[in-house]
């Protein structure tokens, strides 16, 4: 009887690299196929603890991809994330070089998904220490894109723009990375909005929407529509903004995307600013319920803020509670935005002394944003 031949770990390593290529391209079916092949081959592989750690890290990255692609509530992703993290962190002392890079980079993605931006940046910065070990251009572009994304959310606008352009230049050379190209266009447009140049953001978003439609990707189409709504709001065209937000909400609802609370929140915010109180109240109730269903603590707070500020009777206690929550989580970009909206509200209602306190809060948040590098030193 012939003994079963042992598979070299180097061969399985190449297969994991192929798996990672499909993950980065968001090719779910191919990624799932190669994942199964890897799992079968590992059973007959020569002993290699580093390779097994690499497999565990890639399984975690696979879950991050699925969490982005799959509609909310279709799986037990949070439980699986916890189990994978526990397994990987139990072997963290063994991680060196490229494995250490992947651990910190993938963990940063996970923290970002949880809206733990400061924690995400900490892991990205740790990954950066081993970036010199990365030789693949696409992997370098992946890192640049993730840095652009996190710096955008922390309102480090010019740094974010630099990373986004760097990533986009690489992705444009590869036809199979259209999803990332679209996402780079989103970040570039968002940075133009933050620079108060929404008219420069518009062509990037129109291109992104066109590419998303050609890809037939509902998530990216809904994101492009949402970002166009945000852009028109910045331009003061509230009716157009409401229309685009509404289209985004429709897709998010039908696909059960996890960014549905965000889309409804922005639509509700615009409706309140249009003085369309009846429709705004309806969307507020709907959005709050959905945010609770999705266990989205941030947007539960933000919906309650809208109701507290724009409802029939101003609830100053709830307004204060929201700012306290945002400060505890160091979400200064949200503080800046909400403080500005509250100040504008009080100015319009002839209460300049109350507006002043919110302008002061806005300026304080801007200072914290400008000092952002200090938040994630390691």
UniProtKB/Swiss-Prot annotation:
Origin superkingdom: Bacteria
Effect after changing residue 226 to A: Retains phosphatase activity, but is insensitive to PhrA inhibition
Compartment annotation: Cytoplasm
One Pfam family hit: RapH_N
Required cofactor names: Mn(2+)
Regulation: Phosphatase activity is inhibited by the phosphatase regulator PhrA. Interaction with PhrA dissociates the RapA-Spo0F complex. Activity is abolished in the presence of EDTA.
Cofactor: how and how many bound: Can also use Mg(2+) and Ca(2+), with lower efficiency.
Result after altering residue 230 to A: Retains phosphatase activity, but is insensitive to PhrA inhibition
pH dependence: Optimum pH is 7.0.
GO cellular component annotations of the record: cytoplasm
InterPro entries per record: Bac_ResReg_Asp_Phosphatase (IPR051476), TPR-like_helical_dom_sf (IPR011990), TPR_rpt (IPR019734)
Expression induction or repression: Under all conditions of nutrient limitation, and by addition of decoyinine.
TPR repeats by residue range: 101-137, 148-181, 183-215, 222-255, 261-294, 336-369
Effect the entry attributes to changing residue 227 to A: Retains phosphatase activity, but is insensitive to PhrA inhibition
Keywords: Cytoplasm, Hydrolase, Manganese, Protein phosphatase, Repeat, Sporulation, TPR repeat
Domain characteristics, as noted in the entry: The N-terminal half of RapA contains the necessary structural determinants for substrate binding and enzymatic activity, and the C-terminal half contains the binding site for PhrA peptide. The central TPR3 to TPR5 repeats provide the binding specificity toward the Phr peptide inhibitor.
Family according to the record: Belongs to the Rap family.
Protein purpose: Involved in the regulation of sporulation. Acts as a phosphatase that specifically dephosphorylates the sporulation initiation phosphotransferase Spo0F and inhibits its activity.
The protein's assembly and partners: Homodimer. Interacts with its substrate, phosphorylated Spo0F, and its inhibitor, the PhrA pentapeptide. The RapA dimer forms a stable complex with two molecules of phosphorylated Spo0F. The complex is dissociated after dephosphorylation of Spo0F by RapA.
Annotated protein name in UniProt: Response regulator aspartate phosphatase A
Native source species: Bacillus subtilis (strain 168)
